[in-house]
């Protein structure tokens, strides 16, 4: 079988990922829920995973990594927890429904929304961004790469505009994480949402939010955290502020192993191989009658997601 649905999930995981999940199921307890060995082992592993994610995306702030079950939960947490009635948000027409539907829901609650269009090749109309900014604009949220066309968005350009206007910059890295190197620092990203089971090569049921310090987000859910249990509300400190209930420790163990595998292999090597396979597929598929491609065709030397 030739598998062609990696934008939905990667089918083959590295052996070390499968082994890490199995070992966690056999040996790890519940993180933060006790002082016995298996619980402590789980806590240490999850902290190592926070460190790995933080370094991988150049956040370098482990406490700013909050784990979720996927990118959709991460994006809902951010969108529903960051904006209030009267705020204005800018996004693009390229977004996945995990961005658009929560934004439409917030629009019904009084949040203003502007959507930047795209040209004939499905590239963002960047020149429209600054003219969309208002006095009440709070943030720009956009995908790093389209799951439909594979086009990459120039997040460095958007990040610079956001910083110049003191706006929060939120990036959905669902498709690009693990396929394209991402630096939150270089691209001036304030919040990055990711899923673990696509380009990061981790298990399904994993994802998270990377948040720069001093950004306040209302929690999407409340419950047990294993710390400060006497409080009536969620602890204010990250990551516990955004994590309620038992984490997917087994999945996070697999994600930690997957990031280790990517670091050893390097994202750059993965990117070059995927782009080579993409061009090979494109050059042959375009010869098939009645096939139509959306977005820019993949060109050698031009970064493109492994998506057509």
Outline where the language-model segments fall.
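Pyridoxal 5′-phosphate
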Residues: 1-308
């Amino acid at each position: 079988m030739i598998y062609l649905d990696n934008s939905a999930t990667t089918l083959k995981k590295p052996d070390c990922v499968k082994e890490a999940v199995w070992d966690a199921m056999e040996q790890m307890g519940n993180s933060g829920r006790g002082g016995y060995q298996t619980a402590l082992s789980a806590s240490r592993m999850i902290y190592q995973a926070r460190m790995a994610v933080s370094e991988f995306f150049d956040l370098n702030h482990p406490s700013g990594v909050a784990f979720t079950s996927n990118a959709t939960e991460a994006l809902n947490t951010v969108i529903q927890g960051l904006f209030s009635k009267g705020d204005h948000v800018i996004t693009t027409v390229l977004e996945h429904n995990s961005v658009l539907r929560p934004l439409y829901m917030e629009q019904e609650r009084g949040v203003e929304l502007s959507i930047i269009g795209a040209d004939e090749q499905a590239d963002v109309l960047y020149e429209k961004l600054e003219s969309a900014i208002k006095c009440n604009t709070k943030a720009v949220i956009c995908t790093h790469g389209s799951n439909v066309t594979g086009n990459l968005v120039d997040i460095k350009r958007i990040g610079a505009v956001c910083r110049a206007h003191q706006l929060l910059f939120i990036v959905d890295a669902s498709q690009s994480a693990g396929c394209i190197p991402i630096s939150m620092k270089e691209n001036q990203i304030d919040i990055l949402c990711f899923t673990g089971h696509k380009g990061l090569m981790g298990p399904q049921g994993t994802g998270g939010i990377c948040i720069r310090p001093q950004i306040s987000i209302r929690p999407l859910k409340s419950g047990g955290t294993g710390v400060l249990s006497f409080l009536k509300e969620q602890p204010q400190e990250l990551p516990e502020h955004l994590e309620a209930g038992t984490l997917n420790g087994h999945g996070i163990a697999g994600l930690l192993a997957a990031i280790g595998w990517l670091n050893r292999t390097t994202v750059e090597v993965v990117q070059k191989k995927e782009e080579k396979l993409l061009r090979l597929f494109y050059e042959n598929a375009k010869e098939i009658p009645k096939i139509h491609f959306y977005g820019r065709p993949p060109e050698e030397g031009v970064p493109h997601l492994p998506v057509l």
